[in-house]
């Protein structure tokens, strides 16, 4: 099962003509199924392992989001990259876990499309990893090649676009984009390449990059879309999205958390409910012309059902 030019072209047309709705949080949804240590193959917390050990759990999460009415889901591959996988000593399984994650999402999307004929797409998630090349934690070429394996697996599994997400370091972001490009060249595939950055409550990326600098650095790489996800709720994203709307020459996306987490006796909770997220995204679409909307940490199928 591989990416097809027809599906990718349909996604491009949809992004150019209307607002496409993506899914919400993945990790918390997986944890709600209470996977065992055996499910994790003794790699507790490595959600990507579930793509091969418990594909039924991953498929059920995708099904819940498609059931809520979203147009596309992200693959369960946020940590299927060199640095994150190396933490579990499974860097050699990046391609395997990426392909499996994309295949599960693709099969679920096709199942729902088969029911009503409505197109549904798969966004291949390429997460930031756990090392910052700008600080010398890892060599640029190492993570670039790791991202190429990540992207090749996603394309082989049937992803319709590649989403470089939650980026915190511009050098890491560039490595992700170049790795994705090399994967497309190696496989003879062309799909939309989306980049979503994480900006802290301080107003900058983790390493201090401002929104203008990030746009200037990334837009010339030939990406198809740029935007924000994670780290904050929609309120804290407003000014950054305003800047992108004024200065970017490519379409925009927004996938905020359900507000800023609050500590309670039961642990962290996200305060923004479904209506709050929907209202914020509606405002962003109206004022900033977003093409792709969704949710990140703390968002659920109920949030997305209201957003749809």
Name each region found by the language model.
Residues 1-308:
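Domain-level signal for soluble alpha/beta catalytic cores
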């Amino acid at each position: 099962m591989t990416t097809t030019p027809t599906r990718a072209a349909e996604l491009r047309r949809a992004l150019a003509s209307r607002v496409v709705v993506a899914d919400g949080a993945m990790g918390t949804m997986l944890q709600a199924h209470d996977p065992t240590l055996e499910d994790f193959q003794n790699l507790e917390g490595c959600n990507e392992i579930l793509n091969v050990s418990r594909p039924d759990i991953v498929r059920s999460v995708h099904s819940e989001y498609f059931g809520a009415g979203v147009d596309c889901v992200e693959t369960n591959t946020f940590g299927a990259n060199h640095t994150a996988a190396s933490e579990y000593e499974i860097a050699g399984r990046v391609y395997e876990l990426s392909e499996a994650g994309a295949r599960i999402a693709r099969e679920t999307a096709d199942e729902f499309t088969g029911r009503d004929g409505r197109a549904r797409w798969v966004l291949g998630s390429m997460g930031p990893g756990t090392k910052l090349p700008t600080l010398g934690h890892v060599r640029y070429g190492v993570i670039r090649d790791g991202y190429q394996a990540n992207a090749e697996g996603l394309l082989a599994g049937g992803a319709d676009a590649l989403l470089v997400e939650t980026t915190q370091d511009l050098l890491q972001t560039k490595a992700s984009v170049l790795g994705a490009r090399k994967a497309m060249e190696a496989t003879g595939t062309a799909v939309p390449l989306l980049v979503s950055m994480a900006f802290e409550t301080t107003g900058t990326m983790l390493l201090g990059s401002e929104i203008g600098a990030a746009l200037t650095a990334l837009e010339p790489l030939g990406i198809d879309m740029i935007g924000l996800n994670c780290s904050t709720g929609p309120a804290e994203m407003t000014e950054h999205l305003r800047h992108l709307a004024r200065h970017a020459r490519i379409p925009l996306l927004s996938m905020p958390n359900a507000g800023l987490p609050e500590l309670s006796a039961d642990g962290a909770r996200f305060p923004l409910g479904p209506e709050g997220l929907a209202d914020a995204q509606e405002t962003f679409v109206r004022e900033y012309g977003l093409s792709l909307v969704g949710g990140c940490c703390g968002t659920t199928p109920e949030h997305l059902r209201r957003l749809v």
